[in-house]
């Protein structure tokens, strides 16, 4: 709903002031104030001041972050490290659209949109880090494991053109839950990723470096696939040469580096793709799973 549309189509020979000061007028038949406009109300013909004052939005977010880490130096070249964090988010959004707004947008008694979303993300990892040099060689390496656990819960209600039982009463109980309304509910959906990873950089005379990484992830979203047990593996390898460390460079060139690398990337799939589920739509209408795998 763009208030500018009503301004663009407003006749240039008419005065906007009465519709600005009295964007709503009392309707005796409905016993309430309704939108005041010079012509029939449509999606493109609405009083812009009505839209500004009678389309109310509220968007709130509550968030809690906490983290902790600890490390222990075993030797001068070996360190053990553990980290963990939690991220909790609670989003709430609602929109109140008053009765007499365009019938293509809201029902006769108005429209109410309510959305709430909670997510809790837990992450933890353990790593052993190595940093050692000898003669012309150096080695930086790490090996570890991590876990990411995400839990979500969501509810979205939209009366759409199904309208409300009572005009301009914006509560969930007042939504007419007919088939033209919209309901989307997610009950405590959970997703977990367990990982094992390793990385190493071998250097020679501070000029030639070989980088190797490897990671394997096991995702709960792959529970109903052939990759349930083996997850997915993605490595990378790179070789770089810092030229000034090996040869003298011309005065016009301050630095030179050559690098070649190869990598493979991996990712899991969204929730419920490997095991789709049915649900109940607005009005109590069952929506069974009709997408393979059943």
Show which residues each predicted segment covers.
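Extracellular/periplasmic, surface-exposed regions of secreted and cell-surface proteins
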Residues: 1, 8, 36-97, 107-294
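Betabetaalpha-Me/HNH-type nuclease active-site subdomain
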Residues: 3-5, 11-15
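Core domains of carbohydrate- and sulfate-ester-processing enzymes
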Residues: 13-29
């Amino acid at each position: 709903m763009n208030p500018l549309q009503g301004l663009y189509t407003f006749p240039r020979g008419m005065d906007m002031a009465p519709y600005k000061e009295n964007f709503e007028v009392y309707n005796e038949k409905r016993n309430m104030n309704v939108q005041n406009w010079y012509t029939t109300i449509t999606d493109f013909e609405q009083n812009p001041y009505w839209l500004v004052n009678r389309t109310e939005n509220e968007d709130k977010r509550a968030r809690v972050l906490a983290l902790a880490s600890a490390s222990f130096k075993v030797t001068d070249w070996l360190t053990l490290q553990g980290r963990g964090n939690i991220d909790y988010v609670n989003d709430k959004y609602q929109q109140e659209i008053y009765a007499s707004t365009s019938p293509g947008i809201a029902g006769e008694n108005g429209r109410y949109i309510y959305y709430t979303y909670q997510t809790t993300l837990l992450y933890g990892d353990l790593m052993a880090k190595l940093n050692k040099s000898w003669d012309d060689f150096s080695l930086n390496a790490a090996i570890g494991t991590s876990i990411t656990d995400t839990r979500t819960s969501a509810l979205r209600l939209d009366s759409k053109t199904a309208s409300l039982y009572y005009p301009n009463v914006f509560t969930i109980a007042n939504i007419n839950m007919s088939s033209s309304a919209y309901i989307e509910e997610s009950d405590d959906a959970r997703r977990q990723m367990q990982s094992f990873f390793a990385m190493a950089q071998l250097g020679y005379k501070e000029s030639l470096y070989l980088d190797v990484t490897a990671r394997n992830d096991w995702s709960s979203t792959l529970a109903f696939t052939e990759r349930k047990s083996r997850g997915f593996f993605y490595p990378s390898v790179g070789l770089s040469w810092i030229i000034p460390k090996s040869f003298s460079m011309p005065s016009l060139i301050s630095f030179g580096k050559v690098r070649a690398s190869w990598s493979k990337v991996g990712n899991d799939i969204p929730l419920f793709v490997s095991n789709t589920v049915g649900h109940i739509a607005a009005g109590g209408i069952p929506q069974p799973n009709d997408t393979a795998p059943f």
